[in-house]
Amino acid sequence: MEMHLLCETMFTCRKNNILPVHLCILLDDVIHKEKVKAIEGIFFQCVFFKEKLVYTEWTKIKFTYVLHDLVISQIFKNACIKEVIHGALILSVPINIDNLHFDTDILILKIIYPHFLHDDIVIKLSEILSGAPRMQKTVEKKQEVEKPFFHIPAKLGDLTKEDPISFNHHGPLEPPSTVRGLKQSANVRHSHPISRPEKANVTFLSDSWYSQNLKCDFISDIQQRHVLVIFWYELSKGIQMQIKNIQIPPENLFSSITNYLDRVNTYLDEIAERTFRCITTNMEIQNRHLPQKFNSHFQIEFNCTHLISGMELARDFWILSLDRNSCVLKAMASHFLHKKKGRSSLSSNEFWADLIDCTTGKTLYGEKVRWQLNSETSLYSTFRKNQNISWELQPNCYALYMSENLKLYWVLPGGFCVSGTFKLKENDEFFFDWQFGMS
């Protein structure tokens, strides 16, 4: 756990109100080994209740990971844990403990991957701090060294006494403070032997770090998707800190948790409504005339009257599992990233795509798709990673495409398409700064 030792040393230099929380995120089906290798960064944010809810700024933290099994009791001599950890993310979080409210305050960890993918882990601070042990401070005896490295003799006269000066040296005729007539000894010099310090026994912090007492707590995040291990080291600064829990009115209980989840879910609901309002509006503008834009195959028994009911079914499947990986949000994130930093996430013929299979009810969100035009038919075919045939060639499959310049395409079976421009609102940029600003 060198990462914990490094962060402990860094946090010790900070203010006394900063609590170092050392933890591991166990690998699972969501955060697995291949996904861990692609992590671009980890950020944290706290939500505190101080008369009103306060969201701290996103702060990047150091991390490392292990993909092999860890036996903590073999690493730490005095660890009270026998479980084997099958791979983990290892990190430390500095938390401000001023005015803590255990009932409301939460910690949010955001793990960033390429292509605007991220995982949010929301943890109650009370879950973290409830297991903190009350250990007595370990006082290590200082090594007694008889003579320090820079040795100053006890008698200052040895350092301040001037050497006699020989007349044979081309100095002044008479040395200062010399009484005339006093016989001087020529070429007399006093030697001062160099004081060498005795070899001291040096104890490194890492030696004591691995021999200290250690307590581990297993906790889960709010959504019960991940398991985390909290490490309480005997030598950690956090063991000695006094943490005070401030009570709040009952009506404000769990306000930060619900506020965070509601901010995300409410915005996703709004995006779903705006997306299909854009589609239906442009369908009316096109007078319900849907041009064929993609190369596709028709089933022999295909009935065009089923298109409307199929559209409603595909819409419901899309909304049912809608999350921040949707092509609409990724296209908006690409748009704001290009606007602020001049970076393009897509080439001219690439789009973000949500692919809906009405046969199985499953939706693939946020796929990167490339369009290729057939010069003979003037129809497009789509290509993506691990795709054998164009999505539009599969029956009962719908697609939603969106470009970096916010051009939206709703594609039906048969390659028919409704297109329009997705319009931004004032709160969009604020949401994306909050959720994607660190990308």
UniProtKB/Swiss-Prot annotation:
Top-level taxon in the UniProt lineage: Viruses
Main location: virion
Any one Gene Ontology cellular component term annotated for this protein: viral capsid
GO term, biological process aspect, one: chromosome organization
Signal peptide residue numbers: none
InterPro entries: UL17-like (IPR007640)
Keywords carried by this UniProt record: Capsid protein, Host nucleus, Late protein, Viral genome packaging, Viral release from host cell, Virion
Localization, UniProt: Virion; Host nucleus
Cystine residue pairs: none
A matching Pfam family: Herpes_UL17
Annotated coiled-coil segments of the chain: none
Function noted in UniProt: Capsid vertex-specific component that plays a role during viral DNA encapsidation, assuring correct genome cleavage and presumably stabilizing capsids that contain full-length viral genomes.
Quaternary structure and partners: Interacts (via C-terminus) with capsid vertex component 2/CVC2.
UniProt family annotation: Belongs to the herpesviridae CVC1 protein family.
The protein's name in its UniProt record: Capsid vertex component 1
